[in-house]
Each structure stands twice: as C-alpha cells, then as structure tokens.
Curated annotation (Swiss-Prot):
Species per Swiss-Prot/TrEMBL record: Methanothermobacter thermautotrophicus (strain ATCC 29096 / DSM 1053 / JCM 10044 / NBRC 100330 / Delta H)
Protein keywords: ATP-binding, Kinase, Magnesium, Metal-binding, Nucleotide-binding, Thiamine biosynthesis, Transferase
Reactions that this protein is recorded to catalyse: thiamine phosphate + ATP = thiamine diphosphate + ADP
Residues that bind Mg(2+) 2: 52, 80
Protein name: Thiamine-monophosphate kinase
Superkingdom: Archaea
C-alpha cells in the first residue's frame, strides 16, 4: 500500500518539497524557502514574493459575499509580506471559475481591487481558467532592505515573545458564521473573519527598528506559528495564559457555541496578527512605537510550555490549521 500525502500533512509536505529543492539549488538561490516568503537578491534590496491559494469551499465562511472573498485573497498574501517586514509593490491574481453571474464576478474583483488599493499594491497580472468551484491564487510582491528583513530564525533564549493584537477574534467570528446563528452584536468578530487586515505597517515598524530577532504571522494558529519560530531558531518557548490578549467578544461567542475560548486563541488560526521575539530592552522600545502584548519568553529548548492561571506549567502540542491532513 502506497503512502498518501495526507499521512504527512501540509507542513511536513512543505518540508519534503524544501528538502528536494535544496538538494538541487544552492542556498543563495533559495533564500527564504521555508519562511513566510521567498527572497530574491535585487542589489541593495530583497525582492520578496509569496503565494497563497484559496478555495471557495474551504476558505470562505460566507461564499455569498464575493467582495469579501476578493479582499481576503489579497490580504492572506499581504500578511506574509507583513511577516517579513516587506513593503508591498504589486499583486498577481490567477482564478479558476465556474460559470458565475457577471454581477458576482464583478463584485469579487471589486474586492480584489479595493484590497490592492488599501495595501498600495497594484494588480499587475494573472491568469484565468475553468473549474467546478471558485479557486483564487494570489502572488504578492514586495521589497525589503537586506539588513531589515524579518525571518522565522533568530530567536534567542531570554528574548520576550509578543503579538501585535487580540487573539481568537477571527476564529470566533468564523465559527459563529458557520454555525448559522445570529451574528448581531458581534460585528467586529464577523469583520475580522470576512475582511481581515494584514499588519503591513506593524511589520515595517518591527523591521525598521532593528530590534526583532524573529517573526511570523499567526494565520494558522498561535501555537503552530510559535512552533515554526522555535524550530527555525533551535529554541523553546514559554507562554502565560493570563497574558494572552483574548478579544473581548471571544469568551461570549465561545460560550454560545460551546467552544473553549483558549482553543480558539491558541490553535484555530484566522488571526492576522504578527508574533515576534526581541530582547527585553528592545521590546520595551518597541512598546513605545506600536501596540504589542508580551505573552512569554524564549527558552533554551523543550518545546512550547504554557503556564496557566494557577501557575501550573504544561506542554502544548504543536498543532494548528493545516491542509492535507487525514480526516
């Protein structure tokens, strides 16, 4: 019996691809491979490129809002640029579509163009094809100063760990929409789910400060992304439950849905915030420049630990949103 890709899951499959690429191409040709975006030497700067693929049936909790679908397609790509401290320069969109009504298609494209304008990244090309469902593939292009680019590697024991904003809001909004319940009173959570905003400005502040040792975005879940920083840096992580900035509506929505609010904040994903590390003195300087929430520290090793509200320490299993998984 032959193994299938579901036996690996998305992250191990990506590692398999990276390993095969590195066996052929030199390290100077595959800079950024395995990070949030690829880096191409462009003289005094890096050209930063990233690509994300979204499916109608998997990535959009309300496919009856085409403008929001277009917006989100751009934003998920821009979030990877933000994680690298890159300034957007352009966006390429490839689409595979069923025979949509033109009004629906125009609304979808209005969302794409609106987002491109928001991020100051003009739509510069793409491709079209046919499919049984809506498939949207975006490629974002940016630039970053060579000595300022943010990477997943570089965290050191003693560094502090911080996030740029509240956790669990997008997850709570997504689950509320999928439940079919009344979303009245939870407009912010719904907006965070359907029209997230990439933290481009925050990424630029972090990059230009020169104070950050590692960074990534947390669209696939906080614990999963902490695992990425940990593995890339060869360290461990310790976070504190009472320091996690849960969005104010997360506990109430979780109660309505019978969900654990901590689970939504730690594992679900859909939070378009950044998580980063910096030495204590650097983190203090950064706190004067932008909103941030210190949630823990980098440790010598031993995986990811959580200290709960009673002071009890336990290990967290590194998981989060992942495609190509069994079940």
């Amino acid at each position: 019996m032959h193994d299938r890709i579901s036996s690996l899951g998305e992250k191990k499959l990506i590692s398999r691809i990276i390993s095969r690429a590195r066996s052929v191409f030199g390290s100077s040709e595959v800079m950024g491979l395995g990070d949030d975006a690829a880096l191409i030497d462009a003289g005094e700067e890096f050209l930063v490129l990233t690509s994300d693929l979204l499916l109608e049936t998997r990535h959009f909790p309300d496919p009856e809002r085409p403008r929001d679908m277009g917006w989100k397609t751009v934003t998920v790509n821009m979030s990877d640029l933000a994680a690298m401290g890159s300034r957007p320069e352009g966006f390429i969109l490839s689409v595979a579509l069923p025979d949509l009504e033109l009004e629906f298609f125009d609304s979808l494209m209005d969302g794409v163009i609106e987002a491109c304008c928001h991020y100051q990244a003009p739509l510069i090309g793409g491709d079209t094809n046919e499919a049984d469902e809506i498939i949207l593939s975006g490629t974002a292009i940016g630039r970053a100063e060579k000595d300022m680019v943010l990477m997943k590697s570089g965290a050191r024991p003693g560094d502090l760990v911080a996030v740029t904003g509240p956790l669990g809001v997008g997850a709570a909004g997504t689950e509320l929409i999928l439940s079919g319940r009344d979303t009245g009173g939870f407009e912010n959570a719904v907006e965070r789910s359907l029209r997230p905003v990439a933290r481009i400005e925050e990424g630029l502040i972090l990059a230009e400060s020169g104070l950050v040792s590692s960074a990534t975005d947390i669209t696939d879940g906080l614990v999963s992304e902490l695992g990425e920083l940990m593995d890339a840096s060869g360290t461990g992580m310790r976070i504190y439950e009472d320091r996690l900035p849960l969005g104010r509506e997360v506990p109430e929505i979780a109660s309505i849905l019978g969900r654990d609010p901590l689970e939504l904040a730690l594992y679900y994903g859909e939070d378009f915030e950044l998580v980063f590390t910096a030495p204590p003195t650097g983190m203090e300087e950064l706190s004067d420049m932008m909103e941030l929430h210190v949630i823990g520290e980098v440790t010598v090793g031993g995986g990811i630990e959580m200290v709960d509200k009673d002071g009890v320490t336990y290990k967290l299993h590194v998981r989060g949103y992942e495609h190509l998984s069994p079940g």
